[in-house]
Amino acid sequence: MIEVRELVKNYGSKRVLDHISFDVNKGEILGLLGANGAGKTTTMNIMTGNLSSTGGTVRLNGHEILEEPLQAKKELGYLPENPPLYPDMTVKEYLKFAYRLKKCRLPYKEHIEDVCKAAYITDVYDRVIKNLSKGYRQRIGIAQALIGEPKILILDEPTSGLDPVQMLEIRNLITRLGKKHTVIFSS
């Protein structure tokens, strides 16, 4: 499902990733753990095609991210470290925006209902995002990552800034998502 081979990233003369290789199979959950500056976000940005590597390859469901970026990204749902939410939108408006941006072809109403159920946000569907807790905002970010039924989810720091109860909720959500998706998260 995910193949990372000999991944290298240099920023000038500083090497931040040094020949990293790993596989994540269908239905597995992989956590990238490490101190700030360890290269977790850099690895995820390369895996999502948002940053080029100095060397090595990334394949998502058989598609090399640099050679076949459109096909690879169709397999992918991504939650960046700072979810790109629009605080003045309602959850409904934001998810509709994300659905259109991703050019999703699944039946809109049913698909968005499924995404909201999966991310446990149905109870805030009509609320304005800026009025919601950080935990809900993270779940909204996860919901947008689920749009289009991607096989692979990459979640960068999904529990960052959350209180212990919210952290547990997000970790439980990731565990449930791992039953249908291959998941990589950083912490």
Identify the meaning behind each predicted range.
Residues K96, R100-K103, P107-V124:
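Conserved ABC ATPase "signature" region
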Residues L153-E157:
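Catalytic Walker B motif of ABC-type/P-loop ATPase nucleotide-binding domains
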Residues M167-K179:
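Helical segment within the ABC ATPase nucleotide-binding domain
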